[in-house]
Amino acid sequence: MANPIRKLVDNSKQQLKKLNKIADQVESYADTMASMSDSELQAKTGEFKSKIADAIDGIEDKDKQNKALAKVLDELLPEAFAVAREGAKRVLGLYPFHVQIMGSIVLHGGNLAEMRTGEGKTLTATMAVYLNALSGRGVHVVTVNDYLSARDAEQMGQLYNWLGLTVGVNVGDAPAEEKRAAYNADITYSTNFNIGFDYLRDNMVRRADERVMQRGLNFALIDEADSILIDTARTPLIISGPGSGVSQLYARADRFVKTLQRDEDFKVDEEAKATLLTPEGIHKGEIFFNLNNLYDADDTALTHHIDQALRANFNYIKDKDYVVQDGEVKLIDQSTGRISEGTRLSDGLHQAIEAKENVEIQEENKSMAQITYQNLFRMYKKLSGMTGTAKTEEEELREIYNMEVISIPTNRPVRRVDKPDLLYTSIRAKYNAVVKLIVELHEKGQPILIGTGSVEDSELLSKILMTKNLPHNVLNAKNNAKEAEIIANAGQRGAITVATNMAGRGTDIKLGPGVAELGGLVVIATERHESRRIDNQLRGRAGRQGDEGFSQFFLSLEDDLMIRFGAERVRLMMQRMNLDEDTVITNRFITRSVESAQKRVEGNNYDTRKNVLQYDDVVREQRELIYHERDVVIDESESLEWVLMPMVERTINRVVDAQTKEKKSSDWNLPQIVAFVGNALAHDDAVTVQQLQGLTRDEIKAKLLELAKLNYKEKQSQLYDPEQMLEFEKVVILRAVDQHWTDHIDSLDRLRQGVGLRGYGQLNPLIEYQSEAFANFQKMIADVEYDTTRTFMKAEIRQNLRS
């Protein structure tokens, strides 16, 4: 039987062999490029653009054009990469290594390059970005925050500008004109957050010139790709409008749950991050709210608020899951340790936390537009990414994004030592051991980076270090303004830096003078994260570019991960060994248990992301249809009669069919058809019951359609200017579409939140959602067409029509 591991290794070797061969071709141009003058090298950009234009000239079919473009870019790759490489040497003083060329080839191929920390991912990207920007279709370089977008655009932009390409930076709060200019550049630096919301907002505009993204989604190159494509994928992007005010039930539910006793009145499920009332708790609820049955069908709103209050109070922890700043509850991104500005929990959970923290409860918003990052990035013609850690999520990246993860060798051998985990029975004993090691290392002058699992833990460790008179910096979600400065200095002699997960990404930690001789940077972690990737990122801060260093993880049986998954087996083993609190355990069983727990969490998180995607895939088909129809209307330059009149005809057919269901024509509801004509199609006395009697169903439809056509011609004559007529048609159609689409999105949001309960009735929630979402969409289309018909046909024409 074939060994699957051997097959994977062989495939990996084949991939690297192929990459090496192409990288050799790139390097073969080195002397030629070096001999060119600046102007000769810069002229290559125009030469490449001409070759691309010639390759796709005269090809009308879009798919064939895209294939021709891909072919010519592949042919140009060795020479174009060599141009960008030589340009980097002259402009930036940096010359990409062989392994960086390999990484950039992976990026051009639409895959994910896994490159260790300090291997120069930003420089690696330049060659693939340059080549793909030559097409003039736009390249989006996606980063995790505005700071990195601005930094990389400024640094690498010098190279692109020198080579004759334009560079734009899309900052979140920039005005529309600046965003438009940024997106129209050859290369655009932006965060995933900004691109997602700009895409949604562009599909809510009423005029073509209001869009900021004037071109399609061509090529995205994502930095820290695992963070963006995986960690943020559980939270959909939602544009909201004002809702129906704040319910008083949030405060009442919060007061109630604060009277309850743990284990007696409720049970906390740490693994599922849920809290459930016991029978005693339910009884107390019935007394508190003066009800006979807390779970009566008439009181579902109350029970929903109680459920959210329970989660807010007992599953969401202050300074771990969120912070309170300036009277607001702000979420902490668990993968980065940073505050997720502008992100709110849905389904009333955020309001429940606000009630818990006694800050102003903000009203629930109505969803108007939404998309998941999975579906956003799958719309790009080509998607690639780079990160230090992705192999653990290889299956998900392949299945969701059709990307292969290819590990690029390091330029120099890795000398960092990753020591075995140390396990203690209690948090107190663990911190004692951590501080003891910090003191020992600090006496030598060796720099130390200590990674903690939460803001709360970083502040606790900081207090302990203060009592020991150990000078240190703290970096967490509360003080991330100095992030770059703190991290940049973390490799200096004697530096002690306490940080949350945010220390694992972004700015490199470079060793100060004399630090290499001391053994390099030491990374200490006070617990294992849910994800092995986050642990590996933290480890990767030490030993960059062949530097020395080591990493050490300290764990306790009281850590969140151990409590939620698998601590019991380890605890029993330690009890059998009869160990005291301060005794440390280190063996392969512990490491395997922890990694097993992490795999379970990663599996759960993958299931959550897949679930979010499955539900969004239902909406995706509807969203693409609506957005396409909006684009057709907005981009029309002559007349929308060909769009509007079929909508009118379908509305007529629906109304007539609904009122003529009976076999006998004498039983047809002709007065209702006459009422429809007066309400939505023509003037009140345009048709009578007598005129419809004796006609067949099809003849009635034809008569009503003829009335509609006459009405349309009348509107045309009143609006003698075709431009005004077109503007009128656009306003009518877009208003109807937008009103009903936003209502539909909000109703789907509520449907998704409620459909899970049907699982208790042995029904598949996803299938139920698909079925109802489709039925609701069909009804929405009918409502849009009816409102368009009524508004257009019954409108009194006035001049200066504007949306």
Curated annotation (Swiss-Prot):
List the molecular function annotations (GO) for this entry.
ATP binding; protein-exporting ATPase activity
The compartments listed are: Cell membrane; Cytoplasm
GO BP annotation list: intracellular protein transmembrane transport; protein import; protein targeting; protein transport by the Sec complex
Record-level GO cellular component terms:
cell envelope Sec protein transport complex; cytosol; plasma membrane
Which residues hold ATP? Answer: 100, 118-122, 508
Catalysed conversion reaction: ATP + H2O + cellular proteinSide 1 = ADP + phosphate + cellular proteinSide 2
Highest taxon listed in the record's lineage = Bacteria
For membrane topology, the record states: Peripheral membrane protein
Keywords from UniProt, A to Z, are:
ATP-binding, Cell membrane, Cytoplasm, Membrane, Nucleotide-binding, Protein transport, Translocase, Translocation, Transport
Which SMART domains does the UniProt record give? SecA_DEAD (SM00957), SecA_PP_bind (SM00958)
Pfam family example for this protein? SecA_DEAD
EC number(s) reported in the record? 7.4.2.8
Say what the protein does. Part of the Sec protein translocase complex. Interacts with the SecYEG preprotein conducting channel. Has a central role in coupling the hydrolysis of ATP to the transfer of proteins into and across the cell membrane, serving as an ATP-driven molecular motor driving the stepwise translocation of polypeptide chains across the membrane.
Q: Which family does it belong to?
A: Belongs to the SecA family.
This protein's assembly is summarised as: Monomer and homodimer. Part of the essential Sec protein translocation apparatus which comprises SecA, SecYEG and auxiliary proteins SecDF. Other proteins may also be involved.
Against HAMAP family, the record matches this protein to: SecA
What this protein is called in its record is Protein translocase subunit SecA
Q: What gene makes this protein?
A: secA
